[in-house]
Structure formats: structure tokens, C-alpha cells
């Protein structure tokens, strides 16, 4: 057992502590977001620097759509300043291996990555006007698929995907989410919304971004339920659609 592991509280003990605190809250307090009060059940000393970092890695892996073969992680702000002391580095790697914040293997993520054959390297991110708990992940999957993710840890174990391959995204991975990169031309939005309507899938939120008129654009569509894989493949074949990335809650 290395010195790093002593930073962590055993998850079951942490959960019991939280239940004890919750039992003392009155009903009005219980209406608050519990994560805002005491944070998630997790392995690690910080909901922002550890639990949120695990979530960033986990969601990024799912967006890549396959196991990560290699990754470059560029830390920014307080992530960079306290990355080792709060276990942010190990937490990110743990998430990229598919671990959740309460996984007892989080302190040993580097060793687990070696077993899995996943290589990783850390550096400093050069970002402007970014959240202080930000990271850039440049991932390569087993098939050779690549994806760049810029993400931020918001506190309480919550996180946000800020950009995908340089395009705005801004979603928190709390719904099944379609990220559609397309040409900015008439009909692309209708193609996506019509397909979802035919599938009986309600749209929770819809964000649209473009770099210029007629240039590159992106749709971020948070859905009330999962989108079937065959429908995603169908979307990718439509005129004007360049790439579809999907975050599944399953």
C-alpha cells in the first residue's frame, strides 16, 4: 500500500457518515441537492478534484465509444496545482478505465492502467477563460478512433463536457446525449429532430453552435431516453452530418 492511499476514506464508512448527517437534516434542508451539501459517495479526499475527475474520465471514455489505448491529459488551474495531492491524476485515469467514483481501485489506477495496457501522460493545458478545474484529454481508442475532450469539474462530484474536438458542447452527462457535428445548412436540425420524433424520444434540451454561416456546426441534444445504436448509424449517413458522438447512461 503506498502513501497515496491514506488520503482516502473507505467508501462504506464514508457512506455511513453521510447517512448519519442526512438523518439530522430537517425536511426543508432535504429539498436541497444533497451533493451540494456533502458531495457524492466516493473514494478520495475531494468531490471536485477526485470524484469529479473520475466522472470526467468515465464520461470521456464513453464518448470515445471504446476502451482507451493511450491518452494525453493536460491539466489546468487548480487541477494542475493540486493534481497529485488530491489524486486528480489517478482519478482521471481511473475514470478512463471505466471506474466510478466509489470504486476502491481508484488509488491504484496507475497500476490498473498498466495491467490494461493503457498508456497515459500528463502535462499543462494552455486554456483561456476556462473553469479552474479543467482538463484536456486527447484520447486514442483501440480501433484508432481519436477524440479530444475539454471538461471541467463543477463541485459535488458533478462535471461538464465543455468541448469535443474543438467544438462547443456544454453538457453535464445527466441525460443520454447526442452530439452531432454537421455542416451549417438547412435541414440538418430537422433531420435529427424528426428521427427522434419517429422513435418517440422526447428532447430535454437542444443547443446549437456554429463557427460561421455555412461552416462547421454542432447540435447537442439531451434526450429523455436512450437512442438506439442503429438510429445513430443512420444519422451518420445523412446529408450534411459529419460525425455523431453519443453519451449513453447505460
Question: What is the meaning of each model-derived region?
Answer:
Residues 2-3, 8, 26:
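Intrinsic-disorder-associated, low-complexity terminal segments enriched in Asp/Asn/His/Tyr and depleted
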Residues 4, 19-20:
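Intrinsically disordered, low-complexity segments enriched in serine/proline and basic residues
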Residues 29-41, 71-74:
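Short, hydrophobic/aliphatic alpha-helical segments
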Residues 39-57:
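Conserved phosphate/anionic-ligand binding catalytic regions in large, soluble enzymes, centered on
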Residues 63-72, 120, 139:
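Non-transmembrane, aqueous-exposed alpha-helical and coiled segments at domain scale
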Residues 72, 76-115:
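A structural-propensity feature for long, helix-poor, extended segments
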Residues 122, 150-250:
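A conserved regulatory-domain signal marking ACT and ACT-like small-molecule sensing domains
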